[in-house]
Structures are given as C-alpha cells and as structure tokens.
Regions:
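N-terminal subdomain of nucleotide-sugar transferases
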Residues: 1-44
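Membrane-proximal helix-turn-helix segments that form the acceptor-binding/catalytic region
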Residues: 23, 128-142
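A short, histidine- and acid-enriched strand-loop-helix "catalytic/donor-clamping" loop
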Residues: 13, 102-103, 117-129
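Short loop/helix-cap segments at secondary-structure boundaries that form the rim of catalytic
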Residues: 52-53, 102-109
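Short, well-ordered alpha-helix to beta-strand connector turns
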Residues: 2, 30-31, 91, 110-111, ...
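Short His-centered aromatic/hydrophobic patch
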Residues: 96-100
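A conserved catalytic-core segment of Leloir-type glycosyltransferases
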Residues: 41-91
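Active-site proximal beta-strand in glycosyltransferases
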Residues: 32, 95, 107-122
C-alpha cells in the first residue's frame, strides 16, 4: 500500500485550482491525502475543520484560539498529530509547499519528505524573517 500523503500548504484549497490541487487530487486516486491549510486564528476553541473533497482527499483547516505565532504553531502541531493518530496514519510522506509549516511536522515519523518549491516565498511582501532558515532546514530533510 502506498503511504498516506500529509501535505502542508500556504494556499487555501478552494482559492484557485493550482499545482497543489492538481497533484494532490491525482495522488488521492491511489492513496489517502490530507491537505493541511494554514490556520484560521481567533476561534472560540482550537479544532480542525475537516472537509472530504473526494475519495482519498481530505482538506484540514486548523482553527486556533491564540494569535501568537509560537503558541499557534505549537497548538496546530498538537492538533495535526492528534488528528493523524485518530485517522490511523503511520509513517506518511510529508509534502511541503511552504517551509513555514516545518514545525507543524515535529513528532511525525515520516517515510519521506518532499519540498515542492513552486514559489520564491521569501520575495513575497511580508515574508517572515525565519522563512529562509526554515527553507534551508527543509531542503536538508527532503
């Protein structure tokens, strides 16, 4: 059986049909795919909204109470690990579209890591200062 893919993306699934949508939809024909979106902050409780897009493809949107980046990353990582455990996911292939999601995968034992760098995110207006360091770390792991 092919490993489950856990995809971390900076793009909302329903924003516009782009490379992540195309590839993850294709992969979902043969394996489970969990597409993890960036969180929505300011929720009354921390949770993961789950939307089944089709056979094998599930979009997960974390909703977080706290708006502190560090606490938000920590809480999001906890929610993702708990969700994957509930789903029986073991040794997934971790697929990243943004290096900023790297801390979210802490504690997840993976079969492989893919960094699909489709944009020069460091050139975007408002790019976080730690983006380049995380990208270098992700390149080392992939």
């Amino acid at each position: 059986m092919k490993p489950t893919i856990v995809c971390f993306s900076h793009l909302r699934w329903n924003f516009t049909f782009q490379r992540p949508n195309h590839l993850m939809s294709h992969f979902a024909r043969e394996r489970r795919v969990f597409y993890i979106e960036e969180p929505i902050l300011g929720a009354s409780t921390s949770t993961i909204e789950v939307e089944v897009i089709g056979d094998g493809l599930t979009v997960c949107t974390p909703h977080l109470i706290d708006d502190s980046r560090w606490r938000a990353e920590s809480e999001q990582a906890r929610l993702i690990r708990a969700f994957l455990l509930e789903q029986g996911v073991e040794n997934p292939l971790l697929w990243f579209y943004t290096p900023m999601a790297l801390p979210l995968a802490e504690g997840i034992r993976s079969s492989a890591v893919v960094y699909d760098c489709m944009d020069e995110l460091s050139m975007f207006l408002g790019a976080p200062p730690e983006l380049m360091a995380r990208e270098q770390e992700l390149m080392t792991r992939a």
